[in-house]
Amino acid sequence: MFYVEILGLLPEMAEAEVKALAELRNGTIKERDYLLVVGNVENVEIFERLGLAHEYGILLGSGDDVRDILDLVRGLEWKEIIKGTFAVRKEVMVNCAHEVKNLEKIIGGIIHSQGLRVNLSKPDTIIKVYCGRKLWIGIRIREFRGKEFDERKADRRPFSRPIALPPRIARAMVNLTRATREILDPFMGTGGMLIEAGLMGLKVYGIDIREDMVEGAKINLEYYGVKDYVVKVGDATKIKEAFPGKTFEAIATDPPYGTSTTLPMDRDELYKRALESMYSVLEGRLAIAFPSDFDALDVAETIGFKVIGRFYQRVHSSLSRYFYIMEAR
């Protein structure tokens, strides 16, 4: 069993990201308790790709009350679970339904009584206890620190433009496509989506109608160590012209919204033509963002897409958007 602690930002989208990655390893989500998602998966290392998560780990068990969780702790052979020193960390979620004061100390004492050493400052193993509707306990494998994503924000790139998706969201969009080999971004801009996909080991393809953006994206990809890429000047409404005879396993993209750029045609017409172009080269899934005042559902389904997910985000007072997950039928 695994657990993932997702971000409070876009929680439904974060849960869908976990589900998409779990499915790549024949896994399923069993339950979500506020910001804790638990389930089964053949190999938890797939979660190294996560974007909208605080951490993930191995789930040891759960309890309906404190007595249950303490009985579970007493029944485990901790010398077979813990490597080196340990510390217990407690996470009290908004929906915590239990009295958990000092619970981490009590659990730590039980484990220590089995002959294991505590190190609160630099433990080799971190045991996580979560309080929600139920109580959960697991072993942390990886914590995703904000700093590593901040280093890839638009203003930290050598070639920068102010309007770009946050790296965590871009990464989640790539994951929602369930890509395993390659991905295309037909509105690549400065390459943020391609950077995240490339760092996951995917081959990345991108086009942009502006030559300066293409050259800038190359600079950014090289800066972050992404080597397996093909980027060129191209029109998102004419992808086949940019890549003759090529189809793509997955597409993830964030088209211009029309507020920060001069569009080459009417905004809604651009979106429609771009969706038609993407449909013509797509083998699997598309993850795409649109402003909330664009009727993407109707347009996409008319083209032939099956919309399998939609997630709302209010960015600021003058912009709200939906992230869509679509499949080519």
UniProtKB/Swiss-Prot annotation:
Residues annotated as domain THUMP: 40-143
GO biological process: tRNA methylation; tRNA processing
Subcellular location: Cytoplasm
Temperature-related properties: Hyperthermostable. Remains fully active after 2 hours of incubation at 80 degrees Celsius.
MF term (GO), any: tRNA binding
EC number of this enzyme: 2.1.1.213
Catalytic activity: guanosine(10) in tRNA + 2 S-adenosyl-L-methionine = N(2)-dimethylguanosine(10) in tRNA + 2 S-adenosyl-L-homocysteine + 2 H(+)
Chain segments annotated as transmembrane: none
Any one of the GO CC terms: cytoplasm
CDD domains: AdoMet_MTases, THUMP_AdoMetMT
Keywords: Cytoplasm, Methyltransferase, RNA-binding, S-adenosyl-L-methionine, Transferase, tRNA processing, tRNA-binding
InterPro entries: DNA_methylase_N6_adenine_CS, RlmKL-like_Mtase, SAM-dependent_MTases_sf, THUMP_dom, TrmG10
NCBIfam families the UniProt entry points to: TIGR01177 family methyltransferase
Family of this protein: Belongs to the methyltransferase superfamily. Trm-G10 family.
General function of this protein: Catalyzes the adenosylmethionine-dependent methylation of the exocyclic amino group (N(2)) of guanosine at position 10 of various tRNAs. Acts via a two-step process that leads to the formation of either N(2)-monomethyl (m(2)G) or N(2)-dimethylguanosine (m(2)(2)G).
Assembly with partners or alone: Monomer.
Protein name: tRNA (guanine(10)-N2)-dimethyltransferase
Natural source organism: Pyrococcus abyssi (strain GE5 / Orsay)
Gene: trmG10
